[in-house]
Amino acid sequence: MKRTTNTALKKNGSTAKPKTQPTVVERPGSWHLARTETERRLSDFEFGLERLAQAYYRWKAACLAAVCDVPLTGDDVAVLNVVRMGDEPKRLSEIGQLLNRVDVPNLQYATRKLVRSGLIETEGSSSRKETRYRATATGHSVTEAYAALRAATLPPMLEALDGWAAKSETTSIQLDLISSLYAQAAQVAITRRHQP
C-alpha cells in the first residue's frame, strides 16, 4: 500500500491534518507558475533564460561542428573551452567550479570523451582527484578555429543590437547575482523538504 500523509496519520491514530499551503486563486488562463504579477514576471524571465540556454548550447555545438569532425554537445564544448582557458591544466573540481556545475559524473564523462577524441589529455597523478586536464596540440588548434569562427560570427551580430556594449557588463553582473539567488533558493527548498 502506498504510504501517504493520511495513511501515516491513521496508522499513528493521530487526528492532525496534513500541512496545507496557502491557496492562491488562479486567474482564468493563468498557470501554476504565474499566479501573481511577480510570479508572471519571474516565469517570463525563466522562459527567456531557458530559451537562451538552449540556443547557446546549440550554438556552441554547431560552432565546434563547423571546425571539427568530433561530435560534441554544447556541454562538452564548455568543458573543452574551460580546460583550454589560460592554457593551464585544471582539475575536474576546478572545471566544475568555473562552470558552476556539481554533476561530477557528467563532467567525468565529458572529460573522458574529450580525452578519447584527442582534444585534451591528462597530466599528473593517477588519482582521479589530482588528475589535471590540458588541451592537446589538436585541442589547441580546434579551440583556436572555434574562437576565430565565433569572433567572425557573434560580435558583428551583437554590435548591431542597440546599446549592447553598455548593457552587456551590467547584464553579466545581474546574471551572476541571479545565479547566487537561485543557489540560495535551492538551499531553502532542500531545508523545507525535510520539515514536517
Residue positions per predicted region:
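Terminal interaction helix/tail motif
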Residues: 148-196
